[in-house]
């Protein structure tokens, strides 16, 4: 159940990269911001509407075999390498840095995700794929499954020379209906990304819940202090703080959420 009628006190909860739970397999190195799989913590099941934020590295030729999902909005953001998606509805796509992907599981879908882009007429490679995958519930259960991807590299700028803009990546909010972004079936949430050169900054949106994840580099969060790669800030009743990149630049992912999952 989702609750949007909220009375909240301003708060910033910093979660360091090394506080996350860790899954280390031969083919997978995964860091979990929230409870996931065998890593269950009843005090850390979600923030706002965000249920999963996994920071994954998958070795070449390996990946997640076909598995099911239902009633979940899943957004994937690649940082390095490429990830191949295939699902039971006939969708196939190669996801790379700056290309956002969304899968709405709805009534049920099965898919695989693998680091084997050479199957799509590419050259074999030995590069890991590094990506962040985020899950949240949809507004309505049992919708038709769907898939969408969108390249927003033009808006973001190059990894090493970012535009410095906070770009809408995925949204179900009415305010973003006319924006170039992938659509998610969740009217209370939007995902932004920014690639920041050294010293560049962006202003965070005002929202009941804001989740800031440092995907690359390091930043300074106004009023809080430094955040390094893999760190996150969970902000309640937030808005207006500036995020400034450190000397090596940064890439950040920001969720704006106007509701939370009811306890």
Each predicted region: which residue ranges?
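Jelly-roll (double-stranded beta-helix
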Residues: 1-263
């Amino acid at each position: 159940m989702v609750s949007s009628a909220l009375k909240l006190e301003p708060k910033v909860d910093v979660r360091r990269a090394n506080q996350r739970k860790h899954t280390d397999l031969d083919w997978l190195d995964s860091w979990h911001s929230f409870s996931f799989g065998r890593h269950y913590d009843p005090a850390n099941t979600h923030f706002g509407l965000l249920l999963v934020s996994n920071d994954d590295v998958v070795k070449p030729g390996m990946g997640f075999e076909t598995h099911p999902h239902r009633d979940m909005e899943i957004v994937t953001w690649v940082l390095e390498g490429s990830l191949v998606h295939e699902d039971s509805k006939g969708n196939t796509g190669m996801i790379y840095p700056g290309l956002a992907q969304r899968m709405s599981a709805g009534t049920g879908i099965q898919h695989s995700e693998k680091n084997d882009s050479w199957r799509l007429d590419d050259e074999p490679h030995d590069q890991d794929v590094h990506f962040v995958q985020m899950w949240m519930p949809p507004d309505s259960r049992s919708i038709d499954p769907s898939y969408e991807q969108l390249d927003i590299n033009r808006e973001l700028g190059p990894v090493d020379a970012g535009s410095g803009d906070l770009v809408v990546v995925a949204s179900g909010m009415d305010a973003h209906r006319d924006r170039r972004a992938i659509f998610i079936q969740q009217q209370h949430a939007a995902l932004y990304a920014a690639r920041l050169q050294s010293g560049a900054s962006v202003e965070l949106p005002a929202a009941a819940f804001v989740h800031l994840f440092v995907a690359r580099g390091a930043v300074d969060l106004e009023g809080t202090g430094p955040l390094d790669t893999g760190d996150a800030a969970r902000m309640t009743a937030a808005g207006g703080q500036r995020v400034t990149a450190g000397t090596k630049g940064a890439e950040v992912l920001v969720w704006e959420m106007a509701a939370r999952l009811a306890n």
